[in-house]
């Protein structure tokens, strides 16, 4: 509402469908593996709405909208599994998606992601966790929704300005790259000047940090000084490039 976008959420559609069928969302996901009509029903609706409303500002909240919505700015909003579990525990999603404990929520999220990944590969031959499918990948683990929304809007405007061409960008909090113990007193002294410059940065630092990624763990392989300075300065985001 604040940004005057309509929101179409396939997750909400799926939860409503699960409730109507007296199932949990995980049970519906498992059913959808053997009966693809539900996937096609939801995904066809996504494609139809985008075709019928080319001039509307619509946010498609969907794991596969990037594959069905033409001429769109494609964003993947990531989050650590631990924080995702905390969020769903605190989110009222109805009886069909209610958890008894944090551990149960985390386990169910992992199972759901695995089930959906297999299903999407079976039906559409796509991997929604392949970040090259997106114009922007932004991690939400440590940042506020307002800052994330502002960054997405700014990047989308650049996309429009550049003739709907985008160079894929991946943004994470420096807290995803480092822990407090990774930064020594010597680091704080030697990086003082860079950190002071970064204190003036409201959103994203200008250096691209090269990392390796193993599941949810990032390891910095180039640009560690910039990652540490961003951590010290409490900058919301750094740009990263994942390398093999």
What are these regions (language model features)?
Residues 1:
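Glycine-rich phosphate-binding P-loop
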Residues 6-69, 82-85, 94-97, 107, ...:
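ATP-dependent small-molecule kinase phosphotransfer cores
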Residues 42-43, 145-153, 195:
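Short, amphipathic alpha-helical "lid/cap" segments that border enzyme active or binding sites
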Residues 66-72, 129-132, 230:
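Short loop/helix-cap segments at secondary-structure boundaries that form the rim of catalytic
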Residues 83-88, 145-147:
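Switch/connector loops and helix/strand junctions flanking conserved nucleotide-binding motifs
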Residues 97-148:
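Small-molecule kinase domains that catalyze NTP-dependent phosphoryl transfer to phosphate-bearing small molecules
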Residues 161-219, 231, 238:
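Short alpha-helix boundary/capping and kink motifs at helix termini
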